[in-house]
């Protein structure tokens, strides 16, 4: 009788369990092309799609093993573009797991936002999310900025695009859940106007702030694909494009006691670029909306806590401690405060168009966050993704993302430069009126034409 050596056996298994290591470990060159250039090449020579699909097949198994952002995949025959969908959005034929370890359902139909996709866009994957949108960590790695936490909750949406596994990804944005991962990965992230009718088939977290969001490498990439997404029934009457937009920097974010020197310097670079475009920004205050940032977090927390009774009955699985910590914050929001926040939101949203008219601006610009993106972190039991008013540093923790969320407005995040050490992307947010998605794409494209795309390396795993 022979006896296997435990260490030798596991070593042998690990050496042979992955994809063929002899090829496919370097990102294909075609994935470095802009989508506009790829579109031109495919129009001239459609056979390229099959060649590129073969290269993608070799790359994807290595890339996803390393970056760990895809939760389900399905085959597509030589697609022109690949779409990933956050695992809180239903896709017929693929399981929806909601970031939970031991739950899934198989939807009969796809979410409303996916109804009218152009056939050149293939929905090829579901992508990772944090548990129920409110926990720490989706298990993904940041492709171009490996020391930076990719953030959440639409983590896989940003990581899959940054890794070249998707050309575009659909996520959801409640309080920054698309904008944060996009900015942390050096991508562009668009939060759309909040509309209940656009959210059929999307897991609800905070229904009055939930919104669809899209991630691409650049504003121009998103501009190429936006007409192919079939969103016309959801977009509404869009604000008209202009030769010059009226732009203002948010005065509150200029406070050096709140916003770090690095982010203020980045904002200065964005300001100069806008001036070069003939749209020199002024400054504007939004005191009523600014005062609601904490309310946005409290509303989200309370909504999650109220829904948790239904979750517990349906999911029947153990929740991560950080999910429970976030729910605990919601439990502490009183019924009277909850009603007060709803009334405050109604009042603010009812007057937001008049505010833009009176301020004579089309866009308000401010940093993505008070500080640079945070490094990979190791949260401990008791920590929560939802800040509590009693926490130290609360004004910084509630950040700037709730401004678009509480008002229901669209916003786009655009990377402007790298941090001084070159390890982190620094980004602005541009917030527009309701139904200004096309305007936001337009100004973001122009801004990136001046600032340029962030330098990135060709990925190898």
Question: Whereabouts are the PLM-identified features?
Answer:
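Short, well-ordered beta-to-alpha junction loops that form the rim of enzyme active sites
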Residues: 88, 128, 252-253, 286, ...
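Serine-dependent amide/ester hydrolase catalytic core
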Residues: 39-44, 309-406, 460
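Short, well-ordered beta-strand elements within core beta-sheets of diverse protein domains
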Residues: 38-45, 102-105, 210-217, 329-333
């Amino acid at each position: 009788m022979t006896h296997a050596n435990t260490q030798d056996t596991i070593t042998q298994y690990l050496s042979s369990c992955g994809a063929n290591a002899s090829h496919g470990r370097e990102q294909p060159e075609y994935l470095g092309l802009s989508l506009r250039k790829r579109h031109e090449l495919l129009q001239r020579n459609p056979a390229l799609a099959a060649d590129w699909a073969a290269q993608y097949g070799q790359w994807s198994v290595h890339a996803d093993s390393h970056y760990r952002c895809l939760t389900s995949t399905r085959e597509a025959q030589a697609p022109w573009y690949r779409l990933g969908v956050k695992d809180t959005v239903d896709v017929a034929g693929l399981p929806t797991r909601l970031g939970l370890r031991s739950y899934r359902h198989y939807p009969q139909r796809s979410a409303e936002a996916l109804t009218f996709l152009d056939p050149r866009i293939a929905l090829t994957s579901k992508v990772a999310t944090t548990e129920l949108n409110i926990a720490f960590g989706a298990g993904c790695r940041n492709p171009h900025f490996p020391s930076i936490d990719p953030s959440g909750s639409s983590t896989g949406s940003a990581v899959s695009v940054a890794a070249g596994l998707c050309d575009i990804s659909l996520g959801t944005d409640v309080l920054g859940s698309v904008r944060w991962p996009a900015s942390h990965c050096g991508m562009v992230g668009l939060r759309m106007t909040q509309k209940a009718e656009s959210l059929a088939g999307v897991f609800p977290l905070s229904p009055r702030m939930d919104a669809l969001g899209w991630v691409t490498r650049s504003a121009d990439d998103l501009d190429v694909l936006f007409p192919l997404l079939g969103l016309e029934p959801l977009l509404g009457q869009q604000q008209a494009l202009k030769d010059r937009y009226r732009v203002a920097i948010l005065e509150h974010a200029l406070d050096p006691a709140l916003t770090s020197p690095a982010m203020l310097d980045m904002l200065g670079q964005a300001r100069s670029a806008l001036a070069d475009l003939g749209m020199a920004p002024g400054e504007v205050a939004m005191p009523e909306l600014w005062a609601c940032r904490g309310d946005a977090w409290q509303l989200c927390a309370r909504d999650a806590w109220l829904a948790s009774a239904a979750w517990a009955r349906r999911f029947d699985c153990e929740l991560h401690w950080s999910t429970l910590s976030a729910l605990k914050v919601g439990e502490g929001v009183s019924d009277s405060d909850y009603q007060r926040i709803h009334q405050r939101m109604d009042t603010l949203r009812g007057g937001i168009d008049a505010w833009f008219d009176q301020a004579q601006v089309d866009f308000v610009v401010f940093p993505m966050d008070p500080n640079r993106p945070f490094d990979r972190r190791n949260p401990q039991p008791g920590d929560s993704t939802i800040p509590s008013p009693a926490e130290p540093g609360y004004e910084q923790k509630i950040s700037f993302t709730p401004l678009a969320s509480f008002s229901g407005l669209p916003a786009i995040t655009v990377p402007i430069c790298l941090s001084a050490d070159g390890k982190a992307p620094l980004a602005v947010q541009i917030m527009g009126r309701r139904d200004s998605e096309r305007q936001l794409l337009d100004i973001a494209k122009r801004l990136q034409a001046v600032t340029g795309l962030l330098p990135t390396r060709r990925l190898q795993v």
